[in-house]
Amino acid sequence: MKKTLILAAAAALVSSTAFAQTPRAVDVKDIVELELLTHSEVTQKIKEGKTSVLLVTGGTEERGPHNVLGGHTIMSRHRAVEIAKRLGNALVAPILPIAVAATGVSEGTNTPGGLQVPADVFKGVQLAMIESISYSGFKDIYVMGDHGGGQAQIQEAVKEMDAKLSPKGVHVYYINDFYQKTHDDVDMYMYEHKLPIAGHGAMMETSEMLYEEPVPGMYVRPIYKTVPFNPTGQTPEQWKAARDARAARQAAMAAGNAPPAAAGGGRGQRGQDPNAPPRVDNGLTGDPRPSTKEIGKVVFEIGVNNTIAEIKKQTAQRRGSQD
């Protein structure tokens, strides 16, 4: 009798566990990714008011020994989905996983796996994506990229396609804050919290992917806590001075004045840190070791909020100019 009761209890436990693990059925109302919708579902969503679409470029390149190659694409997808959901009237086109000037792409590279296309080809792809998605019935197309390479071509393509499509009632926008302002704001957050600033595959990207990965180790390997890295070649104070100088130049130019002389350093222009350790050349620049999911959430929110703010600002300006 006792054995029978034990077996019955075990069977009940297995049954309840299996039931608890049964995945929840997909609710199409929650889906904003075009690639996960049928064409009839897209038609219905547009009728319901989702007349905006996000066209986002990610990228495939080395990000150090600890981060997966598709980091730009992964982060772009997570941010874009959240942006669309918060906007409430937008869908997300498939993320383009190839950009211009990917890091580590050269003959005989010791950091394999990267993909890139020439600038003119990339611009042509942007033009084609914008035009083809305009056929679907979207009224506002927001174009952006998470990779520095290709920003100029995205901007050029947006300008050309907006001029072509605006007479048809379709407007195209270049959302630079998805990339540039987000990097600047994240760098400032790191500076204010005395964390490592900037780099490639370092604090910003590692923390954000730790926050986004569905299971530990999928996007960021555990070795990030001990991995050797190349220094950025810049102290925090050198970074701050370069940032302030760049802001002063931008303000002067916006006011129509002659900009002050450029200072050394800044993102992409490194002042020299005389105490920097020797290079290890493993594809990683900057220190990722203090990265956490909590910092990643901050980075994620900065990117999402900056993008939403610029989308709303540009859309309001366009609507106002039409009144």
Which ranges hold each PLM region?
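Bacterial N-terminal signal peptides
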Residues: 8-17
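Extended, histidine- and acidic-residue-enriched regions that form the cofactor-binding/catalytic faces
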Residues: 21-142, 146-323
